[in-house]
UniProtKB/Swiss-Prot annotation:
One of its GO terms (cellular component) is cytoplasm. Belongs to the TRAFAC class translation factor GTPase superfamily. Classic translation factor GTPase family. EF-G/EF-2 subfamily. Residues 5-280 form the tr-type G domain. The gene is fusA2. One of its GO terms (molecular function) is guanosine tetraphosphate binding. Keywords: Cytoplasm, Elongation factor, GTP-binding, Nucleotide-binding, Protein biosynthesis. InterPro entries: EFG_II, EFG_III, EFG_III/V, EFG_IV, EFG_V, EFG_V-like, EFTu-like_2, G_TR_CS. NCBIfam families: EF-G (TIGR00484), PRK12740.1-5 (NF009381), small_GTP (TIGR00231). It is found in: Cytoplasm. This is Elongation factor G 2. HAMAP family: EF_G_EF_2_B.
Length: 695
């Protein structure tokens, strides 16, 4: 069996354009996985292998690539940096043991870097920091280090320092080993010399080394005591302390370089091996109860000797067929084995297993705990499903995905395209849990739902190019919701007599606003049997089914509490169906009385703008009903954070680019639902009524 201490499962994540994919390419080149280096500038990289990715120069899917460095196996996942694809970042963090956060030397800590950093903190993933693009105009390593402290609240441990600035950037100083690495102009990563530290940098290097040593020895009380008494720790002792501090998230070893110019990548690879944890050094994944989702107290111990347990974290349909990416947490998996999908209760036989090299694949006959592999041709497996030993059923902690906030109606251009479109969308939904589809029951339209405009643009693009389905695309629609604002007590009787046995159900109930985010909650405090206990679930079912369509404009209803406290029944005519119908009638009767209100999705918006356009940008956000929450002046411009209704953000990127001469950037993610102003609500309700009348 392969020694688990020689495994590293790592992710590379950052803001769009910080250089993640280029960094991954350079890692693959250095580890001998590719011979000609791809380049995002011309759309030829190994991990960006979808047409849409190559064309837009952004990474959409997390491609998994295996490679080797210093006798260690590195499974590298290149994650997308655009906020519409954060679900991919979240998904990959779930299966990683460590990561590299890439920051742009001139852009610094940009909006998406902050979101990804927050996700990684929540997942407790150990990270290295790579400050990239130091050959760029305006690049400043020390300023980015400062931003990491101030904006992310993190402790960077400076491991390398840049030699030269901007176009004169020629190499880096390894602070720990007091060595200078200088590359020639050939652009080849292997063409470097180890030299003495430049004379004008010696004092700076010593100051940073002292800080490095002081921070590192805090991880070992005995070593710290010896250091205080004047004993210099050895390189090996320091490495051990840095490894421990990195694993415990006490600090983040920080490196610098230029991936595009092939400078500084070797030191990052050495650091991955030296400081990031092996699979058996991270907290094992908890096992959960299949029905409640609560942790059982058991864990999936990372060992090849345990029963088989794995998590399916990505489904992909490519030119090779259906691929299910899995991270194996425990046990071994051999070709021909039968495994249980604990989510469906069905078993599947493992046909082909492959190790992915981005768009290439190597056939495998077996895999073990710590491996990230793809299984070919699995049926009925979705993202987040647990695969396990047939004799040892278990469920790993499931993945939770954000709710889509934007939708569009689509239809095939030609009549014969419906079936083709349905099959294609089915595959795409299996691949991306944040992308959803539903059919409008009244119009029969197919509605696609996603995380943002770019997300849906790409999906429509994939349908056209990958699956050959030409579409007619409607206007984006906002996912409004409805709720109530007042608590009321009410009563409703359902009575029907038409020969034979009739229907009778009477309910007395209280209906009131619930806590934000609770959805629908139901309770019964009936005493004395006026509504027999066997009918309570029918009352709950009736109310719950009506939550799908609110009374104002037909949007789903949020955050309502219903308490059944009394009622009446008939020994012959009462039935579950009668009480269910009574609850539906009660909902229709009481919602308007309880002050029904329209809610709209509010987005957390993060805008970067050059300083001379701040006034324009803030004025524009105010016109969009935005609430400015924070403003931070940075190196190259100003970050503005605020809450803005989604309905006001369509087409914003175009406006922002015009206002800032193409230099502005923004990201947004769903924050919460808030009441619509009356003028907006009236417009939305009127439009919904018009559409209903037209149907």
């Amino acid at each position: 069996m392969t020694d688990l201490s020689k495994y590293r499962n790592i992710g590379i994540f950052a803001h769009v354009d910080a250089g993640k994919t280029t960094t991954t390419e350079r890692i693959l080149k250095l580890t001998g996985k590719i011979h000609k280096i791809g380049d995002t500038h011309d759309g030829s990289t190994t991990t960006d292998f979808m047409e849409q990715e190559a064309e837009r120069g952004i990474t959409i899917q997390s491609a998994a690539v295996s490679c080797f460095w210093n006798d260690h196996r590195l499974n590298v996942i290149d994650t997308p940096g655009h906020v519409d694809f954060t679900v991919e970042v979240y998904r990959s963090l779930k299966v990683l043991d460590g990561g590299i956060g890439v920051f742009c030397g001139s852009g610094g800590v940009e909006p998406q870097s902050e979101t990804n950093w927050r996700y990684a903190n929540e997942s407790e993933v150990s990270r290295l920091i790579f400050v990239n693009k130091l050959d760029r105009m305006g690049a400043d390593f020390f300023s980015v280090v400062d931003q990491v402290k101030k904006v992310l609240g993190a402790t960077p441990l400076v491991m390398t320092l840049p030699i030269g600035r901007e176009e004169d950037f020629v190499g880096v100083v390894d602070v720990l080993n007091r060595q200078a690495f200088v590359w020639d102009d050939s652009g080849l990563p292997e063409n470097y010399e180890i030299q003495d530290i430049p004379a004008d940098m010696v004092d700076d290097v010593e100051a940073y080394r002292e800080e490095l040593v002081e921070t590192a020895v805090e991880q070992d009380d005995d070593l710290m005591e010896a250091y205080m008494e004047g004993q210099e720790p050895s390189i090996e002792e320091l490495k051990r302390c840095i490894r421990k501090g990195t694993r415990d998230l006490a600090f983040f070893p920080t490196f610098c370089g230029s991936a595009y110019k092939n400078k500084g990548i070797q030191l990052i690879l050495d650091a991955v091996v030296d400081y990031l944890p092996a699979p058996n050094e991270v907290e094992p994944q908890p096992l959960t109860d299949k029905d409640t989702g609560e942790e059982t107290g058991e864990v999936a111990t990372v060992s090849a000797d345990e029963p088989f347990r794995a998590l399916a974290f990505k489904i992909m349909d490519d030119r090779f067929g259906a691929l299910t990416f899995v991270r194996i947490y425990s046990g071994k998996l051999n070709k021909g084995d039968t495994v249980l999908n604990s989510a469906t209760g069905k078993t599947e036989r493992i046909g082909r297993m492959v190790e992915m090299q981005a768009d290439e694949r190597n056939e495998l006959t077996s895999a073990q705990a710590g491996d990230i592999i793809a299984i070919v041709g699995m049926k009925n497996v979705q993202t987040g499903h647990t695969l396990c030993d047939v004799k040892h059923e278990c469920t790993l902690e499931p993945m939770i995905f954000p709710v889509p906030v934007i939708s569009i109606a689509v239809a095939p251009k030609d009549k014969g395209g419906s079936e083709k479109m349905g099959i294609a969308i089915g595959k795409m939904v299996a691949e991306d849990p944040s992308f959803q589809v539903e059919t409008d029951e009244e119009t029969g339209e197919t509605i696609l739902k996603g995380m943002g405009e770019l997300h849906l643009d790409i999906k429509v693009d994939i349908l056209k190019r990958t699956y050959g389905v030409d579409l007619v695309v409607g206007q984006p629609q906002v996912a409004y919701r409805e709720t109530i604002t007042q608590a009321i007590e009410d009563s409703y009787t359902h009575k029907k007599q038409s020969g034979g046995s009739g229907q009778f159900g009477k309910i007395d109930y209280r209906i009131k606003p619930g806590e934000a985010g609770t959805g629908f909650t139901f309770s019964s405090t009936v005493v004395g049997g006026n509504v027999p206990k066997e009918f309570w679930p029918a009352v709950e079912k009736g109310f719950a089914s009506m939550m799908e369509t609110g009374p104002l404009a037909g949007f789903p209803v949020l955050d309502v509490e219903v308490e059944l406290f009394d009622g009446g029944f008939h020994a012959v005519d009462s039935s579950a169906i009668a009480f269910e119908i009574a609850a539906k009638g009660a909902f229709r009767q009481s919602m308007p009385k309880a002050g029904a209100q329209l809610l709209e999705p509010i987005m957390k918006v993060d805008v970067f703008t050059p300083e001379d356009h701040v006034g324009d940008v803030i004025g524009d956000l105010n016109r969009r009903r935005g609430m400015i929450k924070d403003q931070q002046a940075g190196l190259t411009g100003v970050r503005i954070k605020g809450d803005v209704p989604l309905s006001e953000m369509f087409g914003y990127i175009g406006t922002l680019r015009t206002m800032t001469s193409g230099r502005g950037q923004f990201s947004m993610e769903f924050s919460h639902y808030a009441p619509c102003p009356n003028s907006v609500a009236e417009e939305v309700i009127a439009k919904a009524k018009e559409e209903k009348a037209a149907k």
